[in-house]
Amino acid sequence: MTSLTQRSSGLVQRRTEASRNAADKERAAGGGGGSGEDEAQSRRDEQDDDDKGDSKETRLTLMEEVLLLGLKDREGYTSFWNDCISSGLRGCMLIELALRGRLQLEACGMRRKSLLTRKVICKSDAPTGDVLLDEALKHVKETQPPETVQNWIELLSGETWNPLKLHYQLRNVRERLAKNLVEKGVLTTEKQNFLLFDMTTHPLTNNNIKQRLIKKVQEAVLDKWVNDPHRMDKRLLALIYLAHASDVLENAFAPLLDEQYDLATKRVRQLLDLDPEVECLKANTNEVLWAVVAAFTK
């Protein structure tokens, strides 16, 4: 409770100081007209980002968030028994690309097709700045005829019996994501000896970022629960679904008290019981998101 109070007071101090600095700059500029208003709005936007605790250095992709939830803090690797996270991370990539305006589903036409039969098409091939995302986007763009969401999850994971399609597999995804997190100051890199071989591991070095991620997931199904997926932030909704599909959501709920844990899992179950075919017809939805959900919950 004390640490929460300290963080809150710290945010207030930063907010007050930022407002004071912005006011001083505006007075020094002498009003400034329209350009001054634009600069003030830009400063407010930057301040909002700081208040959320999401600076450019620590803003994580969906894939990085799911991996971070699955990594053991001290050991620096995911559970050897987790065989779900590989496909889960590929689902994250498709949703991340869709949220960034790069992918969409083909039009459903007069005879409405199901989400799982509609093909994924490239909406924009503009680089994202993320090597893994750009690699996946290149595959989708260059593949004719197009593939469905479920096929892409399997192809990007290398789960295909067709030797002509093995080149679609994205290799060393977890290691590459971990290196991204190292560059962002979240993880570090170590070598550990496992009997007959050495293994590169990535222990947690910035616990604040992981705790903030865990708190965000917990609050989404507890204190900030809205009982309507369309009123939730799409990225957060996708994180809950994909963390569950990757079998790492339990790690975010482990610290909860029994009553909170039961309530959180009950609300996640409510989300899992939704029909993606129905939800994708509602206003302001992302069809790729619901298609990925359908692929994992069918």
UniProtKB/Swiss-Prot annotation:
| Tissues/organs with expression | Expressed in all tissues tested including brain, heart, kidney, liver, lung, salivary gland, skeletal muscle, small intestine, spleen, stomach, skin and testis (at protein level).
Composition bias, Polar residues: 1-11
Q: Name one GO molecular function term.
A: phosphatidylinositol-4-phosphate binding
User: Which terms in the GO cellular component ontology are assigned?
Assistant: cytosol; endosome; Golgi apparatus; Golgi cisterna; Golgi cisterna membrane; Golgi membrane; mitochondrial intermembrane space; mitochondrion
Annotated residues that bind a 1,2-diacyl-sn-glycero-3-phospho-(1D-myo-inositol 4-phosphate) are located at W81, R90, R171, R174
Q: Where is the composition biased (Basic and acidic residues)?
A: 14-28
**Gene3D superfamilies assigned:** yeast vps74-n-term truncation variant domain like (1.10.3630.10)
Q: Name one Pfam family in it.
A: GPP34
Name listed for the protein in its UniProt record: Golgi phosphoprotein 3
